[in-house]
Amino acid sequence: MTGGSRGIGLAIALKAARDGANIAIAAKTAEKHRHLPGTIYTAAEEIEKAGGRALPLVVDVRNDSMVYEAVDRAAQKFGGVDICLNNASAISLTGTLETDMKKFDLMHQITARGTFLTSKACIPYLKKAANPHVLNMSPPLDVRTKYLGRHVAYTSAKLVMAMCTAGMAEEFRKDGIAFNSLWPRTGIATAAIEFAVSGKEGLKSCRTVDIMADAAYVIFNKNAREFTGNFCIDDIVLYESGERDFDKYRVDPTRDLGSGDYMIPETMPLPPGVSLKAVR
């Protein structure tokens, strides 16, 4: 997995670790960030404590040789690759005139190119796996202007991830490799979102990382040959798997969860009985 030293990526890793999973964490954070918690080494410690085996790897997903070497090392240590989780991303929710080109390039190199590269490096190993999955942390592929008109640089990078899902699902369907995307209905309470978007107060109107971890777990356990090319929303995935208690994922039940993420189309409404309004 890429970008798993904290937040959603780490939560997904810990969920899998409780089943004894072997997890390679490919991320840049070898030393503590001045604003954000966690490194690949602290993440590895948490994974091992949860019951998994961890391989922390310092990787810049913009660097081809580092990505290929990391995938090869993971395959050699664990005997193959069953799942590729493209979680690494860069975010800047700015308009066109406010986005400098350095930030634009960073988002597209990490989010878009990094997803393509990491998937490409994993595919030869995934072809040999029993139930191979690639999961991209991207929104549904919807290019209507109402979505693109907000934060064009960031949104377009995330939509390239979605295009990788759609295109590779078709390209590698015959190989039995599943390519799917997963996206949250609401804001998710992570240190990165607190720092870059909402602040501490804004986190109270979010769901916890557990909802994304639980949804990813459901996807990974589906038959790869039957479930591919899907754009999944966290609460829909869980509802369809039988979950009915979504209030447990709220950071603060007394706060509304907002109107939902701007990149989720109207064709993917809330599951029956699920509300974003405060519950008490």
Predicted segments with their positions:
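Canonical Rossmann dinucleotide-binding motif of NAD(H)/NADP(H)-dependent dehydrogenases/reductases
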Residues: 1-26
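Active-site-adjacent segment of SDR/Rossmann-fold oxidoreductases
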Residues: 19, 166-177, 223-225
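Conserved mid-core segment of classical short-chain dehydrogenase/reductases
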Residues: 37-39, 68, 76, 90-105, ...
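Active-site loop of short-chain dehydrogenase/reductase
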Residues: 51-53, 80-81, 113, 126-140, ...
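Amphipathic alpha-helical dimer-interface segment in Rossmann-like NAD(P)H-dependent oxidoreductases
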Residues: 72, 76, 93, 101, ...
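Catalytic Tyr-X3-Lys loop
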Residues: 82, 90, 97-117, 135, ...
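Catalytic loop of short-chain dehydrogenase/reductase
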Residues: 127-128, 132-174, 183-188, 198
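C-terminal helical subdomain
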Residues: 181-182, 200-280
